[in-house]
């Protein structure tokens, strides 16, 4: 898993170790300087650190926690990433199969169904069925995190398959998924002409800038368009700073959070 994450451009994993997730730590050690682990004091901190890493790097943030009571503490940080469309891969584990019956008897603190708990704040959740499915699982997680409207995903790696040795075929990671936007949509010529016509006919046009303008790397183009048309621009909270706030055409942040 550590090698696959490094293939997708991840250079740091934020988390709190546990016995169930030790294979990830051994893998990070084996990868040398390609990827490192940063110890956090709390699982909640790990999710916010992964969120910040994704925002700053333009890639995917990764956090990890142990089974059950560790992984479910991801919820507040993943909720922020979900609401603001930040690509994060959260990694948890699961107890051995003979422990799972305790989930229904209320005697196992680490047998909480993490996938169900985190489902409302993640785009996608999956469980590793066999170690040979690891390349497919991590690639799907990365693709889900950065495609469409980006957001967090959750991977659960049960005790036994997480400790098995990979014996599957050679694989090649899709490095296009290493940063945003992974797949940039291209409008047709007709759509471009239509947009130009709408702008020409507008009497007092105003731009509204959202977080997608940040993640698409379009700051320079947006500034050039605003200046060429003398068009003021307002921003949502996540679009704050796309057009510098000291720019003469900046209207600041709109809504109750604006000024």
Predicted regions and their residues:
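N-terminal alpha/beta PP-like core and its mobile active-site loop of ThDP/TPP-dependent enzymes
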Residues: 1-259
